[in-house]
Structure formats: structure tokens, C-alpha cells
Design a protein with these regions (language model features):
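Gly/Pro-enriched, hydrophobic low-complexity segments
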Residues: 151-265
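N-terminal leader/targeting segments and the immediate start of mature chains
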Residues: 15-70, 264-266
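Edge/loop elements at the starts and ends of beta-strands within beta-rich repeat scaffolds
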Residues: 46-54, 66-69, 76-81, 186, ...
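Sec-dependent bacterial lipoprotein signal peptides
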Residues: 1-16
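Hydrophobic lipid-interacting interfaces of membrane-associated proteins
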Residues: 59-65, 90-93, 107, 213, ...
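An acidic-aromatic
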Residues: 18-20, 81-137
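Flexible, processing/modification-adjacent segments and terminal tails
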Residues: 35-41, 53, 109-179, 254-258
Length: 266
């Protein structure tokens, strides 16, 4: 299991070229001062909704106490609904393919003739990738956005020292913990997020960096993810990105090769 997990964690990228997206209408509130969370959350939701599909190629570097692993990956996603990740060999061949949808996940190793599939859950994604995160969180990480917030009334807004950023304190319920997000005041991009579990432990750090506009849409070309309780971190360096160019349904219909052996993980 560990070898498959490490191989797929470095996997998040599928054939993307260029970087074209229909012009993004800059919200009228960008550049203005927010004193309450509601209007800022509305802008972030608008931006998240503006990103429908992504295709990209990226370099993934996974760091664990035992070793560092680096490989190119391909990413294809439909925001909030489906994700396809391919780990690529030095020759560009996919050595592992993950397809995750709202209710199902499948992992195929084309070269070794092995596969695994099952119901969608954060545990299932963790089994394959080593990152026990749900589909919504994975998409938010890969796009540098703030995941949807169920109840905006549970958000508090503070101003960072120096006045260059906002801090959003998001309560996610007594059993779910909370989240703190830092949003740049200049362009309202999500620069970092920290998740805490119900006991107050930091369980996820996300940092977005190297923002560049794609058709007017501010996109982070470097993302760093850390799971401190697992001593595991992942850096994603995008090489090229295409936004809102559409993706084929067939990319999310991963077939099991004839004669493939099912992976039995404990």
C-alpha cells in the first residue's frame, strides 16, 4: 500500500497546455476594505464558481521522514465533482491513474496490471494517495481556492497586522473543528489555510504562492500542503495550466484492464 500511496501522491497532473480562460470579471469589491465577512465570502464564492474545469501538468514533490519523491503529474478536474490524477514516468507514461467522483474512487496501475476501487471517502483517497482528504478539499488545494462554507454566519473576519491581508476564522461545527484562512487584501487571493480538528490540533496547512493571471483569473503556480500530524508534505509546481476549456466525460470513466489483479490493502 505504501508504495502505491507514495506513487500516487506525486501524481496530480494530466496533459494541460497553454493557459487560456474566458476573461474573469474582477469583482467590484476587489481593492475595497471589508469590515464584515459576508461580502468577502461572497467574492470568494464567486471566484470559486468561476473555475469550472482545469487541465494541467505539474511537478509533485512528496516529503516524508523516510524519503523525498519527485515526479511529473497530470491533473484534470471538474470543480467539486470529479478529479483525475496521473503519475507519469520519466518517459511520460502513466504509472498510476486515480479517478475520483462524488461517490466512487478507482486506482489503476497500467504497467503492473493492478487496480483498486471503492466508495468515495477521505479514507479511500488517503489509502491511495497518502493524503486522507475528501474530494472537495483536494479540488480546493489544486485550485488555490477556499472550500465551500456550509454556514457563512459561522465566519469571523479580522485584519492582519500591517493591513495587507484579511484573516477568516471559520467554525465548522463541534465535531469538525475550525479553519483559518488568510486572504490578500490587494487581489483577494487565498494565500494560506490552516485546519484544526475538534481537539484543536493542526491537521492541515495549505500555502498558495507564485500567483499569475490566466485570462485575468489569479492562479497559484505553487501550492504547498503539510499534514503535521503525519510528518508529510507535498509541493505542487505547475508547469502549464488550462482553465475552463472543457474536459471529456471519458476521462472520468477509468476502465479496469482485462485480467488486472485487485490490490488487497489492509
Amino acid at each position: 500500500m505504501r508504495c502505491a500511496a507514495l506513487g500516487l501522491v506525486v501524481l496530480l497532473c494530466v496533459g494541460c497546455q497553454g493557459g487560456v480562460v474566458a476573461p474573469w470579471a474582477v469583482p467590484a469589491r476587489v481593492g475595497r476594505t471589508f469590515d464584515t465577512p459576508g461580502p468577502l465570502m461572497a467574492v470568494l464564492a464567486q471566484r470559486r464558481g468561476r473555475l469550472a474545469t482545469l487541465k494541467a501538468r505539474a511537478r509533485f514533490t512528496l516529503r516524508t521522514p523516510e524519503q523525498d519523491i519527485s515526479a511529473d503529474h497530470a491533473v484534470v478536474l471538474r470543480a467539486g465533482r470529479a478529479l483525475r490524477l496521473e503519475t507519469l514516468s520519466p518517459l511520460g507514461q502513466p504509472t498510476g491513474i486515480l479517478v475520483a467522483t462524488g461517490d466512487h474512487i478507482r486506482w489503476v496501475e497500467p504497467l503492473s496490471g493492478r487496480y483498486w476501487d471503492g466508495p468515495m471517502s477521505s479514507e479511500a483517497i488517503g489509502r491511495v494517495t497518502g493524503l486522507p482528504l475528501d474530494l472537495e478539499e483536494m479540488v480546493a488545494i489544486l485550485t488555490g481556492t477556499l472550500p465551500p462554507v456550509a454556514d457563512p454566519s459561522d465566519v469571523r473576519l479580522e485584519h492582519e497586522p500591517g493591513g495587507k491581508a484579511y484573516r477568516l476564522l471559520i467554525e465548522e461545527g463541534p465535531l469538525a473543528g475550525r479553519q483559518v484562512a488568510v486572504v490578500a487584501r490587494r487581489d483577494l487571493t487565498v494565500r494560506s489555510r490552516i485546519r484544526y480538528d475538534a481537539r484543536g490540533r493542526e491537521v492541515l496547512w495549505v500555502t498558495n504562492d507564485r500567483f499569475r493571471a490566466i485570462g485575468g483569473y489569479p492562479f497559484p503556480w505553487r501550492e504547498e500542503v503539510t499534514l503535521p500530524h503525519r510528518a508529510l508534505s507535498l509541493t505542487v509546481d505547475y508547469q502549464w495550466v488550462r482553465l475552463n476549456q472543457g474536459v471529456s466525460d471519458e476521462l472520468f470513466e477509468l476502465l479496469i484492464p482485462p485480467g488486472a489483479q485487485r490490490i488487497e490493502w489492509e
